[in-house]
Amino acid sequence: MKIFGRVVSGFGEGKYFVGLIPYKNKFKELTGFTPYEGTLNIKLKTYFDIDKYDPLEFDGFEIDGKEYFGGKVLLVTLFNKSGKFVDCAIVSPKKTDHSKKTLEIIAPVNLRKFLSLKNLDIVKIIQALK
């Protein structure tokens, strides 16, 4: 798998959700890293079907009567235009306000800062080796 997309602003909700302890612990278990509290959003030209790539699944949970949904994670490597990269993961929640053309990426670092990314920058994503 090799796809290209553009960095876009999200809704600002990634920080909240990734910061929830059950999600943070599950992401660490599935990816091997503690995620930075936030996501990088990548807009694609076409629909992305995560199920084609054998993703890892995670269950939802409940906190104080509020339900939080599960989803899927796919280990990938994200490259900036200079070739600098970070091993990270696509997160595909069962419930999202994003279109199927927008990927949410989690990583152990702030990807915008570490890779010097700004809105509309083009990035390359490849599936990580298992």
From Swiss-Prot:
Gene3D superfamilies: Riboflavin kinase-like. It catalyses: riboflavin + CTP = CDP + FMN + H(+). Pathway: Cofactor biosynthesis; FMN biosynthesis; FMN from riboflavin (CTP route): step 1/1. The keyword Transferase applies. Its EC number is 2.7.1.161. FMN binds at T96, E104. Mg(2+) binds at T39, N41. Pfam families: CTP-dep_RFKase. Binds 1 Mg(2+) ion per subunit. It comes from the Archaea. GO terms for molecular function: magnesium ion binding; nucleotide binding; riboflavin kinase activity. Signal peptide: none annotated. Its cofactor is Mg(2+). The keyword Flavoprotein applies. CDP binds at G10, F11, G12, E13, G14, K15, V109, N110, L111, R112. GO terms for biological process: FMN biosynthetic process; riboflavin biosynthetic process. Keywords: Flavoprotein, FMN, Kinase, Magnesium, Metal-binding, Nucleotide-binding, Transferase. Catalyzes the CTP-dependent phosphorylation of riboflavin (vitamin B2) to form flavin mononucleotide (FMN). HAMAP family: Riboflavin_kinase. Belongs to the archaeal riboflavin kinase family. This is Riboflavin kinase. It comes from Methanococcus vannielii (strain ATCC 35089 / DSM 1224 / JCM 13029 / OCM 148 / SB). The lineage of its organism: Archaea, Methanobacteriati, Methanobacteriota, Methanomada group, Methanococci.
